């Protein structure tokens, strides 16, 4: 299991290195088919609409937080981890499976039009509440010291149960020699042991060592 910070552009090169080093013959990803199809159908139009609103906010003098901007566009664009995994699997001729739930993707993505309304972007992009540095610090506190600084929600539990079962079925069907599952770093927590039957080794892509 490779834990990433969603929307962190600096993580792309690190994820590429981890994939090449691990050399999996099957990759699974915390990404849904609904999310893929939504971006194919509406991503371009949403990015244009958001870009126009952002240009207006900048013209009004709003200081845009770059981390918040990255997080916004990571929701509209194809996730960096999807691009990295797709390119790796194409090069190696191996399977990539999207294993997240469509239900929660549809609920969250169907709010996108409201999210990119100008006044909502004013609040969202003027805040530094979710910086990459803070995400990395939170991850290391948990992975290295066991200090939990984030909630593990019921939604996460349902999604992890779905994803772990899906991965288990895929492993039985395809019998790969090595599987890599790419997910947000919070899913490495797994307080209910939903991935235990898969005997995962866990790593945060910003670290060099495995965090078992």
Model-derived features with residue positions:
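Compositional signal for N-terminal targeting/processing segments
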Residues: 1-212
């Amino acid at each position: 299991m490779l834990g990433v910070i969603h929307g962190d552009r600096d993580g792309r090169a690190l994820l590429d290195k981890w994939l090449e080093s691990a050399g999996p013959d099957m990759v699974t990803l915390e990404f849904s088919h609904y999310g893929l199809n939504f971006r194919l159908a509406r991503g371009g139009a949403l990015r244009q609409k958001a870009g126009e609103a952002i240009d207006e906010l900048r013209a009004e003098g709003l200081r845009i937080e770059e981390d918040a901007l990255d997080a916004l566009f990571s929701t509209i664009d194809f996730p960096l981890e999807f691009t990295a995994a797709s390119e790796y699997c194409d090069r190696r001729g191996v399977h990539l499976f999207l294993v997240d739930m469509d239900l929660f993707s549809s609920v969250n993505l169907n709010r996108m039009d409201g999210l990119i309304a100008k006044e909502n972007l004013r609040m969202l992009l003027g805040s530094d509440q979710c910086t990459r540095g803070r995400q990395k610090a939170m991850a290391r506190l948990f992975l290295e010291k066991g200090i939990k600084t984030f909630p593990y929600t019921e939604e996460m539990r349902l999604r992890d149960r779905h994803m772990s079962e899906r991965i288990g079925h895929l492993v039985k069907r395809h019998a790969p020699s090595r599987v890599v599952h790419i997910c947000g770093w919070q899913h490495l927590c797994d307080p209910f042991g939903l991935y235990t039957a898969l005997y995962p080794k866990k790593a945060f892509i910003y670290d060099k060592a495995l965090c078992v």
